[in-house]
Amino acid sequence: MKIKHFLPLLLLLGSNEMLTAQEIALTPQPAHLTVKDGRFEFGNQLKAKVTPYQGDSIRMVFESFKKELQEATGIKVSSTQKEAKARIILDLNPQLPAEAYKLNVSKKQVRIEASRPAGFYYALQTLKQLMPRNVMAGVATSDHSQWSLPSVEIEDAPRFEWRGFMLDEGRHFFGKDEIKRVIDMMAIYKMNRFHWHLTEDQGWRIEIKKYPKLTETGAWRNSKVLAYGDVKPDGERYGGFYTQKDIKEIVAYAKKKFIEIIPEIDIPGHSQAAVAAYPEFLACDPRDKHEVWLQQGISTDVINVANPKAMQFAKEVIDELT
């Protein structure tokens, strides 16, 4: 009888150990992850040592993490130059690739190694994922019993240099706050290229000062719903656009999260919104009626590439963007 009960007990213990490893849910999955015994307990306050770096950029990365941590948990992190007193250590390791990092969480301390600010930033995103979900969500809670981390050793580096996400705002306008939220989510998942689709047949979303009608006319259409099949235009005035000030603000916001913004401008096709704004030199037939498109799909009302003025328009739009 004892033997019969002993074998299931061994299997149960083994399954619990496997489950512990499975519970370390990180996205993207690190290249190497080892789970150890014990947990790192935060307490109400702790000290951190941050390696010096040009422009103090590593410290700025950590200050952003500190702010998020305190807002969600109330835990205060102060600085120290003495490693023996530090419970969080950010240490330079020149041997690591630019976006790579090592993260070692033990019962006594959290140690992060990287060679560039981006590596430290990605390590801190992983650290947030190891914490309770409300930290990722930025939602405050007073239950300090939750504030601990599993003991782990992680070595990680991206498989791909270009890790992109595309958002189509030509067809539907989302606005500045939503774009920042998208950038926040990209940063959590260590994506680094935001493909921002800003023009389409159905709308032009970026201010071009040399061609103001692109947003005065091209940013607006007479239906929120795009017609398709049995779905008809609803007649609602709909649209929006970003000023150049908005664009600069969003670019700066993304840069702090190591995300490069790639603006997408469709020329000569997918351009009916632009044609509607300047039919006199963009349209293949200026005598036709041209309006911002109300349909799903792709319009055949394209920019006339045989017109030198249209080619000059394309050049000047790109020049103003850059």
Placement of each model-derived feature along the sequence:
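Feature activates predominantly on carbohydrate-active enzymes
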Residues: 96-301, 307-322
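Bacterial Sec-dependent N-terminal signal peptides
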Residues: 1-25
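Contiguous, structured surface segment used for ligand recognition
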Residues: 22-160
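Local alpha-helix boundary/kink/capping signal
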Residues: 14, 34-36, 269
